[in-house]
Amino acid sequence: MLNNNAVVVKENGQERIVMGPGIAFGKKKKDPIQATKIEKMFIPSFENAEQFKEILTTTPLEIIDLSERIISHAEGELQTPFHDYIHVSLTDHLAHAVRLASEQLVVHNRLAEEIRLLYGPEYAIGEWAVLEIERALQVTLPKEEAANIALHLYNARQTHPNMATALQTVTLLNELREQIEVFFGQTIETSSMTYYRFFTHMKLVLARIEQGETLHDMDDVILSAVKTRYAEAYACASQMGNWLTVELDTRVPESEIGYMALHIERIRPDLERSSTYENL
């Protein structure tokens, strides 16, 4: 027995973890479990079985219950299966986040904006989860916690890449945004549609580079016009292209830099408006 709501059982010689409200209340070892009380059943992998057991025995029940509610809500909203390890990773993360909040310690996530744009459905669930946690536990979580939860959900989706791949994409996009801000000395208005178009374009560029696919091609005449007409934007894009070449060990062609420059030029009015708002 792990706690009143979770217990380890064996079926056909295979160890399983079953969960349900009060499923183990008043039970002793080897007592039968009522099938009608089982809400969830897991067959933990060899790698996470002991972690799962430890978390279920050491984490406050209200955290476990919240984690399971979030996972169930996410499964319904996203209509996708999750890897079983989400029950370990998310529960452990929430316990840590709540502990920090209770100690009034704030850990900021500098990638939160990129996560919001990249993983919108998961981020929306993260926002819902933050409100649920705050309401249930009477704590105040940092705004970025929605992004942290979103990343856990995204990486637990069985059809998606692992945490390392997702984090690399988020980190690269965050770095590219910061390069533009440093180059022009102004802050990007990330909620604008023009920035979203640039963000989406760069996300596709990174995906094509990762998959070894051909990037955009641009007519030489148009490329020459972009260099002349949008010289500053092209210089910024060229700097970003050189950085990506080093980071990804793949040359970014000049034509792709031209497309990046066009997107950068389109977001420059948003840069100026954002800077104006900050100076008021």
Model segments located where?
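A cross-family "folded-core" feature that marks the main globular domain of proteins
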Residues: 1-280
